[in-house]
């Protein structure tokens, strides 16, 4: 059936366009040489000053996307609320290359929330090094 191929479309993709322009949300999209230097083809992030109003929708999108796609998942749930999550999704093929896909979601102190989507040739280790070397 056709909808099986639609799995390629992740629900979190819609969140970036939907919330990217909101007042208390910072959207970052990298392109060009920065992406290349980290072996990424896509990097998108949303940082919510207060993620609470968006939390349920983000959580639903993540649950949907991980269902058929997740190869690896790490989640921290607190009273039914997803506090932090990391997913490595099944590879996707683009222009003859198999690309890794990652979703990272985290609620920090004062309800600040971050949602990141990464696609590229980079390995899980490279991705972790890139994300956490700045901390």
Task: Mark where each language-model region is.
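Second-shell loop/turn segments in exported
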Residues: 42-50, 116-118
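Helix-rich interaction surfaces within compact, conserved domain-sized segments
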Residues: 36-42, 55, 105-106, 114, ...
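A short, solvent-exposed beta-edge/loop patch
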Residues: 88-123
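N-terminal targeting signals for Sec/Tat export/insertion, comprising classic cleavable signal peptides
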Residues: 17-43
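Terminal interaction module
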Residues: 12-16, 70, 135
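Short, low-complexity, Pro/Ser/Thr/Gly-rich segments in the mature regions of secreted, periplasmic
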Residues: 123-135
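Bacterial Sec-dependent N-terminal signal peptides
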Residues: 1-12
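Mature extracytoplasmic domains of secretory-pathway proteins
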Residues: 46-94
